[in-house]
UniProtKB/Swiss-Prot annotation:
This is Cholesterol oxidase. GO terms for biological process: cholesterol catabolic process. Predicted to be exported by the Tat system. The position of the signal peptide cleavage has been experimentally proven. It comes from Brevibacterium sterolicum. Keywords: Cholesterol metabolism, FAD, Flavoprotein, Isomerase, Lipid metabolism, Oxidoreductase, Secreted, Signal, Steroid metabolism, Sterol metabolism. GO terms for molecular function: cholesterol oxidase activity; flavin adenine dinucleotide binding; steroid Delta-isomerase activity.
Length: 552
């Protein structure tokens, strides 16, 4: 986006902006719940009043992932009553087994979003499919399928923080400056990175414990084989509480990270957003969360603000009600896919026709490629494996094979001799979201062949390790047989509503004052590391500007 677009946004913002007094006037929506006598340590402390048809709210946040959680916290701290609309459920009620989430080895309906079968990235082992039939339910992990890729996303209060491995990685500064040149990197690295790390509860594993525990034998084996081929490895921070994990290993607390839990949620240990940012927002007494509601339309309202249409669904995904509410300001935080699809649809259908032509562009899969190697029997990986990754192979500085590869667990409960890696490659390929008038849906133009550049980069690294070790790839993990590379999915969707192109330099949609984008759709397709910390930090930076310039 040019400076002129930003200046135009500043000029028009005053015409249609809503004053802070008007924002505060909407407090009636949450008045019954503001005077809470005590606060729990999770977002379940937020009032769960369901939005009613015809309600008016000062600030509506679509989604409760990283960007949405930051927006909710900073708005409520500024005194603004804020309503989050979340498509998934609130994961705060145990099932019949006494647990909120199910484990990976024995998944049930809680595992997947409105699916009849689990859909794990490692789908096969030694010729056998390992996905299992389940009852259809609003489970925690979604694998949304497009023609060339499936995208894993978290569903529920806390978004992707509920289902990821928690690796809290800071991107290389020179690469951050390359992909987001309009953002002051000094400010980001000196102010917003530390703030986000604190807010997310980032911590580091005790390296002495790491070296001795059986639970990280897989990571030590992955490190050893990488280093023998001349590659650099690095410890990586995480939001899983490693002191809790030590107690798990000692048998003092219930196992989660050591109990086969991660992609379908952790019952303990992980500092997901419902326990950090969202819990802090709830503690202000000004946050309300409406769950099991899916936003389908946003358009200017008569007079001022925006009309937001949403569908209420039941736990089997059936639409049980349609509602229209009015919001003075709307913050899009439905994730790279959700926000991009919604805005592309709104532009194409004439509800927000003046959105930039850049909306929908610049989507990428963060270069995600998964691969497994078959180690020799003397390089075992262990029958006991923590589900929380703590180490990666850092080859980003190599221009011929720039990758950062997470040494991933394969917690099967038995010795597999498999080293598994989730590689983030510097794949330059991008795609766009586009409206399909024939189906009325939004398509993604990504083709599976666009992963070939990423495969080529990863292959240079892992071919070298295999050659040095005298080992081979596992070809039975991502299909029945003869499929080496997991190249048909991503855990790290990024882009679609790029910062300073589709928005101004702070996530405003300048053609529509009062509309903001605060999630991973702002990041142009690849950040070189696990992206959630970057998304959080960018949201912190943007919300500082939005609150100081547009609201207060």
């Amino acid at each position: 986006m040019t400076d002129s677009r930003a200046n135009r946004a500043d000029a028009t913002r005053g015409v249609a902006s809503v004053s802070r007094r008007r924002f505060l006037a909407g407090a009636g929506l949450t008045a019954g719940a503001i005077a809470l006598s005590s606060m729990s340590t999770s977002a379940s402390a937020a009032p769960s009043r369901t939005l009613a048809d015809g309600d008016r709210v000062p600030a509506l946040v679509i989604g409760s992932g990283y960007g949405g959680a930051v927006a909710a916290l900073r708005l409520t701290q500024a005194g603004i009553p804020t309503q989050i609309v979340e498509m998934g459920r609130s994961w705060d009620t145990p099932g019949s087994d006494g647990k909120i989430f199910c484990g990976m080895l024995n998944p049930d309906k809680r595992s997947m979003w409105l699916a009849d079968k689990t859909d794990q990235p490692v789908s096969n082992f030694m010729g056998f499919g390992i996905n299992k039939s389940i009852d259809r339910y609003v489970g925690v992990l979604d694998s949304e399928r497009f023609s060339g890729i499936k995208v894993y996303q978290g569903r529920g209060v806390g978004g992707g923080s509920l289902v990821n491995g928690g690796m809290a990685v800071t991107p290389k500064r020179n690469y951050f400056e390359e992909i987001l040149p309009s953002v002051d990197s000094n400010e980001m690295y000196n102010k917003y990175f530390p703030r986000a790390n604190t807010g997310l509860g980032v911590n580091n594993i005790d390296q002495a414990w790491f070296e001795s525990t059986e639970w990280y034998k897989f990571a030590r084996t992955g490190r050893k084989t990488a280093q023998r081929s001349g590659f650099t490895t690095a410890f990586v921070p995480n939001v899983y509480d490693f002191e809790y994990m030590k107690k798990e290993a000692a048998g003092q607390v219930t196992k989660s990270g050591l109990g086969g839990e991660v992609i379908y949620g952790n019952n303990a240990g992980k500092k997901s957003l419902d326990k950090t940012y969202l819990a802090q927002a709830a503690a202000t007494g000004k946050l309300t969360i409406t769950t099991l509601h899916r936003v389908t339309k946003v358009a200017p309202a008569t007079g001022s603000g925006y009309s937001v249409t949403m569908e209420q669904i039941d736990e089997q995904g059936n639409v049980v009600a349609t509602k229209v509410v009015t919001a003075d300001r709307v913050f899009f935080a439905a994730g790279s896919v959700g926000t991009s699809k919604l805005l592309v649809s709104m532009k194409a259908q004439g509800h927000l026709p003046n959105l930039s032509s850049q909306v929908g562009e610049g989507w990428g899969n963060n270069g995600n490629i998964m691969v497994g190697r078959a180690n020799h029997m003397w390089d075992a990986t262990g029958s006991k494996q923590a589900t929380i990754p703590t180490m990666g192979i850092d080859n980003w500085a190599d221009p011929t094979a720039p990758i950062f590869a997470e040494i991933a667990p394969l917690p099967a409960g038995l010795e597999t001799y498999v080293s598994l890696y989730l590689a983030i490659t510097k794949n330059p390929e991008r795609a766009r979201f586009q409206f399909n008038s024939g189906t009325g849906k939004v398509d993604l133009t990504w083709a599976q062949s666009q992963n070939q550049k990423g495969i080529d980069m990863a292959k240079k690294v892992f071919d070298k390790i295999n050659q040095k070790e005298g080992t081979i790839y596992r070809t039975d993990l991502f299909g029945v047989y003869f499929k080496t590379w997991g190249d048909d999915f991503t855990y790290h969707p990024l882009g679609g509503v790029l910062l300073n192109k589709a928005t101004d330099n702070f996530g405003r949609l300048p053609e529509y004052p009062g509309l903001y984008v605060v999630d991973g759709s702002l990041v142009p397709g690849n950040v070189g590391v696990n992206p959630f910390v970057t998304i959080t930090r960018l949201a912190e930076r943007n919300m500082d500007k939005i609150i100081s310039s547009d609201i207060q």
